[in-house]
UniProtKB/Swiss-Prot annotation:
Residues 1-17 form the signal peptide. Glycans are attached at N124, N177, N201, N359, N385. This is Alpha-N-acetylgalactosaminidase. It is linked to Schindler disease: Form of NAGA deficiency characterized by early-onset neuroaxonal dystrophy and neurological signs (convulsion during fever, epilepsy, psychomotor retardation and hypotonia). NAGA deficiency is typically classified in three main phenotypes: NAGA deficiency type I (Schindler disease or Schindler disease type I) with severe manifestations; NAGA deficiency type II (Kanzazi disease or Schindler disease type II) which is mild; NAGA deficiency type III (Schindler disease type III) characterized by mild-to-moderate neurologic manifestations. Kanzaki disease: Autosomal recessive disorder characterized by late-onset, angiokeratoma corporis diffusum and mild intellectual impairment. GO terms for biological process: carbohydrate catabolic process; glycolipid catabolic process; glycoside catabolic process; oligosaccharide metabolic process. InterPro entries: Aldolase_TIM, Glyco_hydro_27, Glyco_hydro_27/36_CS, Glyco_hydro_b, Glycoside_hydrolase_SF, Melibiase/NAGA_C. It is an enzyme of class 3 (hydrolase).
Amino acid sequence: MLLKTVLLLGHVAQVLMLDNGLLQTPPMGWLAWERFRCNINCDEDPKNCISEQLFMEMADRMAQDGWRDMGYTYLNIDDCWIGGRDASGRLMPDPKRFPHGIPFLADYVHSLGLKLGIYADMGNFTCMGYPGTTLDKVVQDAQTFAEWKVDMLKLDGCFSTPEERAQGYPKMAAALNATGRPIAFSCSWPAYEGGLPPRVNYSLLADICNLWRNYDDIQDSWWSVLSILNWFVEHQDILQPVAGPGHWNDPDMLLIGNFGLSLEQSRAQMALWTVLAAPLLMSTDLRTISAQNMDILQNPLMIKINQDPLGIQGRRIHKEKSLIEVYMRPLSNKASALVFFSCRTDMPYRYHSSLGQLNFTGSVIYEAQDVYSGDIISGLRDETNFTVIINPSGVVMWYLYPIKNLEMSQQ
C-alpha cells in the first residue's frame, strides 16, 4: 500500500507540473492593460478600444518597427475581450469588437512571427466583470485556448476564494499540459495571497507557472514603480532564489512610452526590471511611441542582459545614506550587470566607489560598458576608484566583464 501511495503521489506531481519547456529567459512582448485598460467604446474611440483592430495594428508595429526582431514576440490580450459563453459553455469573444474571432487573430499574429497571449480569471467574474473561469470550466477553457492556437495564458484571481485559487491554478496547469499545445502560463495567484510565505508556496509556483505576479498592479506613475521596487527589494531574500529559467517573478508591465514617467525614470525602470530578470512586457501605444522611448526599450545590450541564459535574478547590494542604491545581477561568462540608482530629488550626484566596495574580489581586471551611453571604462580592478554621475530618479548601468586574470597570467 505504501508503494502504491508513493507511486500515486509521484504521478499527481508529474501531472501538476507545467512541463512545457517555455520561457527559459524572461518573456518579452506587449500587453494591452496598462495603456488601454477596459476601453470598450469603439463607437467613440475606435482606434483605442479593446478590439481585433487594436491588436492587429500593434502586431503590425511589432513586426515592422523592430520589436519582434529584438525579442518582443508576445502580443497579449488582457481583460474585456470576452463576450460570454455559447450554449456548450465555451468562451466567446465580443462579436462586435472581435468579429472574426480569436483563431483569426491568432493566425494573423502567427503570420507575422509573433505569439498571441490571452486573459482569463480564476473566479466567477474577471476583474472587470466579464465571465470568469470557475473550477468546472478550467479544462474546457484550456482546451478552447489550445484550439484557438493561443501561446500564453494570464490567469487572474478576482472574485475567487483562497480555496478556489489553491485548486484552480494547479488544475489549469495540468489542463494546459493535457492539451499538448505549449502555452506559457502567467499566474496572478501570489498577488492575491500577499506575495509571501507561508500563504505563498513558491516551490509549487515554480512547478506550475512560467511567471507569476507577486504584488500590486502597476499604475502610470513613478510612485507606483518605486512601491513595487521597494517591495521586491524588501523581500529579495525570498524572491530572488525562486526565479530562474522557466519560472519568473513578475513586477508587472513597463510604463515606458506612456505619461507618468520622465526620461530618467523610464531609463531607470528599464534598467531595474532588467537587473531583476523581470519579464519585459510593454504596455504603450506602439503607433505613436517616441524615438527616445523606442531607444530605451530596444537597447540591444539591455536586452542581452535581461535575456542572459543563466536566468539569475539580481539583488540590491548597497543602500547608501546619500540615497544611492546599487544593484547587481550575475551574468554568463563571469560578467555582471551593475545599476547605480539615485533616489534623490535634488540634482545630479557624484557617487564614488570601487569594485572592492561592491564585493568584487580577486586579481581580475575588468572592463565596463555603460549600457545607455555605450562608453567603455577600462582597467577596473577591485581597488580602482571610480565616479559615476547619476541624475535624480535616474540610473547609470554598467555591463561589467573580466578581460584578464592576473593570477593566471603570472603562472
